[in-house]
Every structure is written in structure tokens, then in C-alpha cells.
């Protein structure tokens, strides 16, 4: 099994593309959802955040107040790095657990929905394939203005706050162009899924794990049938 990192930009159509992958039966892990999950009360990251940033980052119900925490780290790289040092290891642990579940269920690949895949680069080394949902800037701007009822200035400000899609497209192994008709984009998704399903890149890991399990089973057999009876 191998990992596919999927990203896009605001109003590029990433959510719609993910829905198509899910309809095709693909395994999808939303890293943003996972990041919110690991800071829930009772989890190690939640405890460490309170220890480091204080109880003022808590809501009345004990959840992390994301706005207050965001304000605390805004324009403060040291604090942001400290928060990342708390949350990123926990996110990776959850990612590994979820990925292993899909491995046991026989999936050939797992898609990780990672909004900041190329900005942070933290998870890039784990990705066998990278995919960007792209659209040209004029299309992106028009969609964002229509979807969020924004004027041109505000929409441009939101787009400019992100890494340009053209830059992401240059860094990605696969580009799904969502600039035109949705039927064309959907066809691209189906073709990419077919390509990934046919890939043999999942075999080395699966073979290695199965070999390891076979070795453990053989050892247990020897212990129970030959060594333990004479102990």
C-alpha cells in the first residue's frame, strides 16, 4: 500500500474531487479533521497545549478555543513552532493508525487530504504520489466570489494569502485541472484512480508485512509444537 497526498487551493474544487474518489471506493483521510481530533479533551496533545499555553485557551466545555490559540501564535514563529511540536507527532500517530486499518482491509492506496501539503512539507516524505486540484486564477476568483458572496478585493486577498496553485502544480506529480466542465474533471479523477489501482507500488510494503507475519507465525508454531512441550 502507498500514500497519495492530495491538496488544492481555496475554491479550486478539492472537496468535490475527494467526493468522487470516495464514490469510487477509495480510502480518504482528512488531515484537518485529524488535527482537530488529536486536541480533544483526554488526548495527550490537549494536555500539553494547556500546560504550555495556559487555561485561557480553553472553552467552558474544556475544548480548545481555536480562535484564542490562533491569536496567541499569530505572527509569533516560536509559539507556532511550539504548537506544531505538540500536535504534529500526534497527527502522525493517528495517520499511521488509520492507514494501517486500511492496509488490513486490503486497500492498495490511501489518499490524505492535506491543505498545506507543499507549504509545510512535513508529510511530503511519506507520499508516494502527490496530486493538486488546479484551476486557473480567473476561474478560482469567480468561484470564490460566487460561493462566499465576496467582492473582488476580498476574494483576491484570500487567494493571495495562499501558495499559488501554479506553484503547487509545478511541484505535484499529478495535476487535476478543474478549470472547465465538471464532467471533464471527473473523468480525470477516474483515470487517475485507475492508474493508481493498477500500480504495483503497493506490493513491496504488503510483501514485507506478510513476510514478517509469516515469520512470527512460524516462530509461534515452533514454540508451541516443539519447544514448549519439553520445557
Curated annotation (Swiss-Prot):
Keyword annotations of the record: ATP-binding, Nucleotide-binding
Organism of derivation: Homo sapiens
Binding site for ATP: 8-15
Pfam families named in the record: CoaE
Domain (DPCK): residue spans on this chain: 3-207
Family, as annotated: Belongs to the CoaE family.
Chain ranges passing through the membrane: none
GO process annotations (BP): coenzyme A biosynthetic process
Name this polypeptide is given: Dephospho-CoA kinase domain-containing protein
Stored CDD domains: DPCK
InterPro entries named among the record's database cross-references: Depp_CoAkinase, P-loop_NTPase
A cellular-component GO term for this protein: mitochondrial outer membrane
Example of a GO MF term: dephospho-CoA kinase activity
